[in-house]
Regions:
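Flexible, low-complexity linker and terminal segments
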Residues: 1-162
């Protein structure tokens, strides 16, 4: 099969289909199809989950970021380092399945996670759940229409390190 974007047109839909391939919107078909897909993804979570870590070893704070927020996070991290904070970065390349295992491991070694998001808290809830009280999960929200100010992220990182 060609990959999406490789020059071929194909129809993609959110419909569920029965075992014959025909669209079916019954509760039973929905449950069967969605459960199969979710279990398939969860079963391969270790091979699907992708993230890039930088300087997390020995860090007091880890910034967990994704998407465009990662670029601004990098600037905030640099500012915090200039103030003497030991801060690492975990940039999520794949958001789901979530990097639960690694967040759990890091939560036992760091004081806090700082999570900048251009919303009012989605991924921070996953970080908080996985940290399970071992480390704080601090949201740095942004309403949109732009990106975070690196100084605001620096302030959050410095505060989390105390």
């Amino acid at each position: 099969f060609a990959r999406a974007g490789d020059g071929y047109r194909f129809h993609t839909t959110g419909l569920t289909h029965d075992e014959r391939g025909y669209p079916a919107m019954t509760a039973e078909c929905q449950e069967t199809s969605i459960r199969r897909l979710v279990e398939k993804i969860r079963g391969e979570a270790d091979t699907i989950t992708r993230f890039v870590e930088t300087d997390t070893e020995g860090a007091d704070v880890v910034v967990v970021s994704y998407g465009i927020t990662s670029r601004v996070a990098r600037m905030g991290i640099d500012l915090a380092r200039k103030k003497g904070v030991k801060v690492g970065e975990m940039r999520l390349e794949v958001v789901w399945p979530f990097a639960e295992t690694r967040i759990r491991e890091l939560s036992k070694k760091v004081k806090a996670f700082v999570v900048p998001e251009i919303n009012y808290g989605q991924i921070v809830l996953e970080v908080e759940r996985c940290a399970a009280g071992n480390a704080a999960a601090i949201l740095v929200p942004h309403g949109g229409g732009g990106v975070h100010d690196p100084e605001d992220l620096c302030t959050a990182i410095v505060g989390a390190a105390k």
